[in-house]
């Protein structure tokens, strides 16, 4: 009798609701239509909810993907479920029946290879690379502009200093030359009139006396 009860329980557990797809280590693209398949017996609840789970991650994944799915259907297609790529995912069938609540069946672990996740990741990487390149270009332009402005300011300062020095030197030399020439000319002009009349006067008097003397002797 005890053996019969044990055998009956074993047969019942084997014949209970069982998920046949996805299979172990199967690659599943959840961004596209994915069909979940199962087998059932008449004693199973008439409906259940479908969850996508991943317990070996942090935080764990426990996402509701379908509600009140009829057990008698034998399959259900989900479409466009968002999930990160990776392994260790499972499908759980969860019952709401008050007489049989909890997990009814659990699939084997499979891998998620969603093209949507890959595309999003690639787009993000591309946007980051573009932003970095733009920042780098902007920084380079700023440095170039700063360097150019500094060089221009330096050149202007040098030119101003050179012109200032040249102007000062020219003015000094001009003033010195002009002053020297003016002083020389003034001195020459002043001394010549003073010296010439005196010389002429002294030469004229002796000459007159000499001529008168010669005339007197001749007579």
UniProtKB/Swiss-Prot annotation:
Range of residues in the leader sequence: 1-16
Composition bias, Low complexity: 114-144
Propeptide: 199-219
List of glycosylated residues: 85
Lipid-acceptor residues (GPI-like-anchor amidated asparagine): 198
InterPro entries assigned: GPI-anchor_Adhesion_Reg, Kre9/Knh1-like_N
Bilayer disposition of the protein: Lipid-anchor; GPI-anchor
GO cellular component, one term: side of membrane
Domain of life, per lineage: Eukaryota
Pfam families in the record: Kre9_KNH
Record's comment on post-translational modification: The GPI-like anchor contains a phosphoceramide lipid group. The anchor position has not been determined.
Region of interest: Disordered: 107-144, 160-205
Protein location: Cell membrane
Keywords on record: Cell membrane, Glycoprotein, GPI-anchor, Lipoprotein, Membrane, Signal
Flavoprotein keyword on record: no
Family stated for the protein in its record: Belongs to the UPF0619 family.
Name of the protein described by the UniProt record: UPF0619 GPI-anchored membrane protein AFUA_3G00880
């Amino acid at each position: 009798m005890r053996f019969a009860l044990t055998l009956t329980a074993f047969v019942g557990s084997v014949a209970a609701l069982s998920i046949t797809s996805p299979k172990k280590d199967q690659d599943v693209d959840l961004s596209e239509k994915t069909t979940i398949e199962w087998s059932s017996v008449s004693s199973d609840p008439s409906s259940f909810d479908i969850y996508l789970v991943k317990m070996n991650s942090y935080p764990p994944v426990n996402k509701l993907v379908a509600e009140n799915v009829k057990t008698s259907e034998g399959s259900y297609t989900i479409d466009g479920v968002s999930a990160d790529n990776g392994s260790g995912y499972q499908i759980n069938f969860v019952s709401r029946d008050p007489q049989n609540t909890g997990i009814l069946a659990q699939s084997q672990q499979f891998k998620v290879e969603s093209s949507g996740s890959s595309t999003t990741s690639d787009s993000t990487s591309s946007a980051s690379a573009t932003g970095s390149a733009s920042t780098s270009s902007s920084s380079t332009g700023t440095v170039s502009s700063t360097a150019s402005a500094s060089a221009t300011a330096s050149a202007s300062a040098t030119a101003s200093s050179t012109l200032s020095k040249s102007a000062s030197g020219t003015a000094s030399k001009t003033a010195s030359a002009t002053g020297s020439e003016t002083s020389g000319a003034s001195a020459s002009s002043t001394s010549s009139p003073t010296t010439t009349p005196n010389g002429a006067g002294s030469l004229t008097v002796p000459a007159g006396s000499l001529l008168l003397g010669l005339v007197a002797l001749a007579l």
